Amino acid sequence: MFDDNGELFFRKKERFYLEQIFMKPHPLIISLGGGTPCYFDNIDFLNLNDQVLTIFLKTSPKELAKRLYKKKDNRPMISHLKSEQQLHDYIAKHLYERLPYYLKAKKTIITDKKTIKSLVDEINLLLA
């Protein structure tokens, strides 16, 4: 979709489906990509719904680069980057630009140096 129609087309579709999901209230957990909260008024749209708990999983650029570099070929926005350092710089720049949107989340969890189990436990506490 990205390659054929570009990012804006993707973001419009993304917003359309976000709206569709919330037309039928039912319990669910949605993991959104890093750009989702930053386009249109997506973060405000999510936060206005009393049934939605937005959580910013705050991760350092170094940790994100380490995690994403192995899988970058499947991600259109970063597949062209040649080194982990280039990826780190790209992530740091985008985190800086996107941080005001991320900080609008109702809760923040710092993920660095935490196990998946401890993160799941922390999220479950927020949902309880």
Labelled PLM ranges:
Residues 53, 82-83, 96-128:
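NTP-dependent small-molecule kinase module
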